[in-house]
Amino acid sequence: YRKTNHIVDFVDNANIFLNNQIETQLTTGYSKAYGAEFYISKNSGRLTGWISYTFSRARNYIATLGDKEYPPVYDRPHSLKIFLNYEAGRKRRCAFAATFSYNSGMNLTLPIAHYRVNGTAFYIYSTRNGYRAPAFHELNLSMTCKTGKRGRLILSVMNVYNRKNVFTIYTSRDDYDF
């Protein structure tokens, strides 16, 4: 468990675009975080590898927001990493590796509705960081073979099952829908 004082975040409805006084759009508070990490590895034999899992939670508290807790962007409760490596052949000239990663998605604030007054659009947002993006996960495979005394042939396939992981989220608007 850890408490961090003097964290900085934006005020609600911050106006940061082309703002020469950005400091007026910032506020301070504190954060609480806790978690646990587990790790196991196998370092000998033809098959080696490791598994790592982390569970962590964080909550921010900002006085100007009523001291209500909210999850920060970096609150990603689950992180799992698995790495396996197998050395094949009598002389172990080729190695086959697999890496799997899973991470909870990031928190974000999204517009949930909008209305117009005299042609100007106004947005209504979800609670601060009230949505979590989809989880990120991928499987990568590789083969490395020694060729001669110094050469190596490496073949890698990234994101084997072609997961469309979310890197960032953009909202778009039209007159009827988001």
Predicted regions and their residues:
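Asparagine-centered polar/low-complexity signal
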Residues: 26-27, 60, 129, 159-165
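Gram-negative outer-membrane beta-barrel transporters
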Residues: 1-5, 13-16, 20-108
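Generic secondary-structure boundary/loop-capping signal
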Residues: 4-8, 23-25, 133, 157, ...
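Surface-exposed loop/turn and secondary-structure junction residues enriched for glycine/proline
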Residues: 10-14, 29-31, 50, 75-77, ...
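Short, glycine/charged-rich beta-strand-loop motifs at protein surfaces that mediate ligand recognition
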Residues: 126-133, 140-144
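C-terminal beta-signal and adjacent terminal beta-strands/loops
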Residues: 101-120, 138, 144-178
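Solvent-exposed loop segments that connect transmembrane elements
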Residues: 10-24, 65, 112-126, 171-177
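Residue-level preference for alpha-helix termini and adjacent loops
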Residues: 6, 46, 73, 135, ...
